[in-house]
Amino acid sequence: MNVSLDLFIEREPGDHGGLGGPDWVRIDESLHREFNARARAMSMMVEGRTVYEMMDPFWPNARGDSSLPDFMREFGEIWTTTPKVLVSRTRTTAGHNARIVGGDDAIAELAALRREADGDIGVGGATLATQLLASQLLDELLLFTHPAVLGAGRPLFDSLDRGEIDWPLQLDLLEHESFDNGVTMHRYAVRGVR
């Protein structure tokens, strides 16, 4: 998840800025190659509707677009071929190796997929990540912090249902890295996830 230094993901709801991200996000070639490597290692991607609709149709088309740099064409191939689960109450169809999970039992279906998965599952979408965290289904957080302070906006997590979480939620740092563009990456394990 791309976040500002003050842990906002958007200045205003829906302020995604397209595939390049909003103007405060610094995604250069080095960072994009990092995204590619991490996405390539995923056995599955779980995406909310908003994220899925930002990705499709750009990334499938990017695979063969010679006007784009190779790292973008590479991500297009990764995104298009990796198995995906689209979590949506409104979508009835999805292409590019995606199936749809939705409705009142979506979290239970995702829990079953997690138990059966052979490898890491990436999650895209703040609302979805919040719901999975509250349901104790996220075992790691991967944050790319961009050197910008937004001052206000949509926070990293929507209001968390107190649920079954023993607050405060404790995290353990697993990995961190700094990039030349000023972005830092922190990967945390979520303590106590079953």
Language model segments and positions:
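Enzymes that bind and transform nitrogen-containing heteroaromatic metabolites
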Residues: 1-194
